[in-house]
Amino acid sequence: MEFAPIFVYLVISLLLSLILIGVSFLFASSSSLAYPEKLSAYECGFDPFDDARSRFDIRFYLVSILFIIFDLEVTFLFPWAVSLNKIGLFGFWSMMVFLFILTIGFVYEWKKGALDWE
C-alpha cells in the first residue's frame, strides 16, 4: 500500500503520454511529407555542403564520455558539501579518498593522451 502513490503516478504519466501521442497523430497533416524540401537538411539558409550522415571523429565521442563521467562524479560533491557539518571526519576523509581516486583517473587519462586534440 505504501507504493500506491508511485503506481498512480506511473499510470497517470502513461495515460498522459498516450493521449499526447494520439492527439499528435490525430492532428498531424499527411501532406507535409509530400514536399521533399521539408525532408532536406537545413544549414542556415544555405544548401547543405555535405551529407548530414557523415562520420564523426572518435575524439568527439571520447570527450563527451569523459565529460559525462566527470560530471556525474562531481554531482556527488553537492550533497557532501551540504551535509559536511553532519557527517563528521569519516565523511570528510571518505570524500577526500573519492576525490583522490578521481584525480588519479584524470591524470591517467591525461597521460594516456585522451585529452589531446592532435
From Swiss-Prot:
Query: GO MF terms on file?
Result: NADH dehydrogenase (ubiquinone) activity
| Mode of membrane association | Multi-pass membrane protein
Enumerate the InterPro entries for this protein: NAD(P)H_OxRDtase_bac/plastid (IPR023043), NADH_UbQ/plastoQ_OxRdtase_su3 (IPR000440), NDAH_ubi_oxred_su3_sf (IPR038430)
Please provide one cellular component term from the Gene Ontology annotations of this protein: mitochondrial membrane
Could you list this entry's UniProt keywords, alphabetically sorted: Electron transport, Membrane, Mitochondrion, NAD, Respiratory chain, Translocase, Transmembrane, Transmembrane helix, Transport, Ubiquinone
Keyword Acetylation, does the record have it? no
Q: Where are the transmembrane segments?
A: 6-26, 62-82, 87-107
Q: What is its EC number?
A: 7.1.1.2
Q: Where in the cell is it found?
A: Mitochondrion membrane
Under catalytic activity, the entry for this protein gives:
a ubiquinone + NADH + 5 H(+)(in) = a ubiquinol + NAD(+) + 4 H(+)(out)
The superkingdom of the source organism is Eukaryota
> So what family is this one in?
Belongs to the complex I subunit 3 family.
Function field? Core subunit of the mitochondrial membrane respiratory chain NADH dehydrogenase (Complex I) that is believed to belong to the minimal assembly required for catalysis. Complex I functions in the transfer of electrons from NADH to the respiratory chain. The immediate electron acceptor for the enzyme is believed to be ubiquinone.
Q: What is this protein called?
A: NADH-ubiquinone oxidoreductase chain 3
Organism field: Marchantia polymorpha (Common liverwort)
Lineage of the organism: Eukaryota, Viridiplantae, Streptophyta, Embryophyta, Marchantiophyta
